[in-house]
Amino acid sequence: MLCANNVSAQIGQKKLLKHINFYVKPNELVVIIGPNGAGKSSLLKALCGDIKINNGDITLNDRLLSDYSIASLATLRAVLTQNYELDFPFSVAEVVDMAHFAHQADYSKQQLMHFSEQVMQALSVTHLKTHTFTQLSGGEKQRVQLARVLCQIQPSLVANKTPYLLIDEPTSSLDIFHQYDVMAQAKSIASQGAGVVAVIHDLSLAASFADRIYMLNNGEVAACGIPKEVLTPALLKRVYNINARLENNTSEAMPHIQMCY
């Protein structure tokens, strides 16, 4: 389990997180939502160990995150940030293969290449493998980088270990088809034994795919629970200042947020 225990963080006088308690278990997709500036990306960075926390601790499998070496962490969790650009002209295949570093001591090159082929096919980027990454569209870059982090945790899944995948706004540059496809991939990875944390803005996507939702506001947890417990008219009004409700018609494949005018 990956946990934040009473975590607070600030930069200068700006408080980013205030006494956050959070957890994600194996076989679970947890979605973090909230308005701009709510602390979503800051919480994800804290869970990754990328920002200094002023209070509390982050634990992975009941061990302090700070006690892990960089190499061992790379085998246990993969992170996709909002900044997925690269300055060098790597091919798509080379970008995905960067994930092999974490596992090259335990797997043959042929096995690792098989993992790369699997995730590229799953994310529909195989046809781009010889293309230069810097020449791709924003959505294509995002899918390639997601393929890289999925490739990083794939060996741990095969070995029946429990990896964690943390992804920050993985659907921000994607069309509607690929938004649902990416979230379906995240859900699939969770069903295979991983713990997945995703920061997303689309509340309908959150309702459709999340096992649990954390709603943040002003650096605090405003609510947490299953989608129907969190996406209530009262909370949507208080946190987002919108009049809306969660529609979950059994005749429809996916629940969605209905605005009330």
Curated annotation (Swiss-Prot):
GO cellular component terms, A-Z: plasma membrane
Residue ranges annotated for the ABC transporter domain, each copy included: 2-243
EC numbers for this chain: 7.6.2.-
Disulfide topology: none
Annotated signal peptide: none
Membrane topology reported for the UniProt record: Peripheral membrane protein
Quaternary assembly: The complex is composed of two ATP-binding proteins (HmuV), two transmembrane proteins (HmuU) and a solute-binding protein (HmuT).
NCBIfam families attached to this UniProt entry: PRK13548.1
Protein name: Hemin import ATP-binding protein HmuV
Organism, scientific name: Pseudoalteromonas translucida (strain TAC 125)
